């Protein structure tokens, strides 16, 4: 299933204002429920990260880590991932458990209870 993107500035601002937040040294995660019943992802990389090459690498790493966590996320959430300077030097395999923990704290993951 393809992830929908958050593209409008209004959507980003709404999630920043009303969403829940968890921060780590590598990534900041904002989560807010939406009425679409679908998962939407927004990525933010500021110029503090470095030049265009570093920012694009940070985005690729975040996307790859999110792809691994995606099947565990409940539908109906908007998620914004903000890259930090350490994101550029982190592999997506190291970022996946961090994202899983953050989304779990924010209540965006499906329960793993098996009957």
For the regions a language model picked out, list residue spans one by one.
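Positively charged, solvent-exposed patches that mediate nucleic-acid binding
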Residues: 1-115
């Amino acid at each position: 299933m393809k992830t929908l993107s958050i593209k409008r500035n209004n959507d980003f601002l709404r999630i920043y204002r009303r969403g829940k937040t968890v921060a780590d040294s590598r990534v900041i995660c904002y989560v807010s429920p939406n009425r679409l019943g679908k998962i939407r992802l927004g990525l933010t990389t500021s110029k503090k990260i470095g030049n265009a090459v570093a920012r694009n690498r940070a985005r690729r790493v975040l996307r790859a880590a999110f792809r691994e966590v995606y099947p565990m996320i409940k539908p109906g959430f908007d998620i914004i991932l903000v890259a930090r300077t350490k994101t550029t030097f982190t592999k997506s395999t190291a970022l996946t458990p961090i994202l899983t923990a953050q989304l779990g704290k924010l209540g965006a993951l499906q329960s793993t209870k098996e009957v």
